[in-house]
Amino acid sequence: MAQVIKRKPTSPGRRFVVSIVDKELHKGTSYGPLTQNKNRINGRNNAGRITMRHKGGGHKRRYRIIDFKRNKDDITARVERLEYDPNRSANIALILYADGKRHYIIAPRGLSVGDMIVSGNSVAIQVGNVMPLSNIPLGSIVHCIELRPMKGAQIARSAGTSAQLIAKRGTYVTLRLRSGEVRKVLTDCRATIGEVSRSEHSLRKLGKAGATRWHGVRPTVRGVVMNSVDHPHGGGEGKTSGGRHPVSPWGTPTKGYKTRSNKRTDKLILRHRNKG
């Protein structure tokens, strides 16, 4: 079980640090055959121009290849170890299948070294097992949910997230997500029993600007302190408030303005997520 530790103020950079310490995690390096180089583009396109702001720098990482499909049916796997993954907020687990293959998966909460898990159409309802939504009882908590059958998990993959199965009707099941959104998903889509590990992630505090830079996040500059050539809120004599409703650097309204434009799947969303 992870511990939330508030660090002692031995220096200005440590004064506000809150760390998440999990002694069950593997102390060594990652499993080499399931890692690859992670080429960073730092938010630039092929012309070298910034297309995503606030990205760049940070510590070098190796990408862990995660098995989001879990399609080795009816072959039991043993959890060899739990690991930290710098590319995501959740922990990952290295599992060894009975046929000798090893895979990385998103580690659910409560999964321990030595546990046996399996995927298939009719497997036991226990943490870490994968099965179609049609075979999961109502009220169950699930994560790593597919949006299309056998495409791989797309919903509820980050630390502490999950969804609850609240209804079944025809070829669709209804899920309630942590965000408050209620949506329909095909019954043939698969999901993993339980919730994602490391729910304490939201309590973490990096404590200083430099730690944010270690994660590859660059500073966010307010529009009102820019020049008028750089932002609609820029310019003016002295300190100004922008003089208009909040917009992005390209003039799109922000702070509540809806930009979702996917009418094809709107019919599957029964209740939109809560406002932040």
Curated annotation (Swiss-Prot):
Q: Which GO terms describe its biological process?
A: cytoplasmic translation
Q: Which GO terms describe its cellular component?
A: large ribosomal subunit
Region Disordered: start and end of each range? Answer: 226-276
Gene Ontology MF term list:
rRNA binding; structural constituent of ribosome; transferase activity
One Pfam family cited in the UniProt record for this chain: Ribosomal_L2_C
- Cross-referenced InterPro entries: NA-bd_OB-fold, Rib_uL2_dom2, Ribosomal_uL2, Ribosomal_uL2_bac/org-type, Ribosomal_uL2_C, Ribosomal_uL2_dom3, Ribosomal_uL2_RNA-bd_dom, Translation_prot_SH3-like_sf
> Which SMART domains does this entry report, sorted A to Z?
Ribosomal_L2, Ribosomal_L2_C
Q: Which UniProt keywords apply?
A: Ribonucleoprotein, Ribosomal protein, RNA-binding, rRNA-binding
Subunit info? Part of the 50S ribosomal subunit. Forms a bridge to the 30S subunit in the 70S ribosome.
Q: What does this protein do?
A: One of the primary rRNA binding proteins. Required for association of the 30S and 50S subunits to form the 70S ribosome, for tRNA binding and peptide bond formation. It has been suggested to have peptidyltransferase activity; this is somewhat controversial. Makes several contacts with the 16S rRNA in the 70S ribosome.
Protein family: Belongs to the universal ribosomal protein uL2 family.
The record ties this protein, via PANTHER family, to: LARGE RIBOSOMAL SUBUNIT PROTEIN UL2M (PTHR13691:SF5), RIBOSOMAL PROTEIN L2 (PTHR13691)
| Annotated protein name in UniProt | Large ribosomal subunit protein uL2
